[in-house]
């Protein structure tokens, strides 16, 4: 399962890079659209691989839990990552405008950090929902305990992210 997760992560970035190369360095707009549309399908491949493994009698492991984390993060942050890469590629290869940068100071920075934390919460909820589906597919809560083991460290990370993100609300960075 770990190999599938790594393959999907590589696939995400390869499809994104190819889509941007084709978009900005060739006249093949249709191919570019197809490649960029295929980027989120990597999540579907990962989800299908995990489901097939569990339905086929595979043991529910922490790697299935990592697959759920990957899917949650990809759904919550994927469009933002694609936009980030697109802005930089357009600027570098198509003489587009300079990429937008998040605010570094003041209330705008605090608002940005809070928004990113809420996006992190969305990723966590999606990951938990995927784990819930995996648990239902296995049909035995005792066999799926290793799946849920990934949620505790993730909750700690989410808590640390909360403290850092919301600290800027109480004490904004000064310019």
What are the residue ranges of the model-derived segments?
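Short membrane-interface loop/juxtamembrane segments of multi-pass integral membrane proteins
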Residues: 94-118
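Long, highly hydrophobic alpha-helical transmembrane signal-anchor segments
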Residues: 26-72
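Select subsegments of transmembrane alpha-helices in polytopic membrane proteins
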Residues: 35-40, 114-127
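N-terminal signal-anchor/start-transfer transmembrane helix
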Residues: 6-26
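Alpha-helical transmembrane segments and their immediate juxtamembrane interface regions
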Residues: 138-175
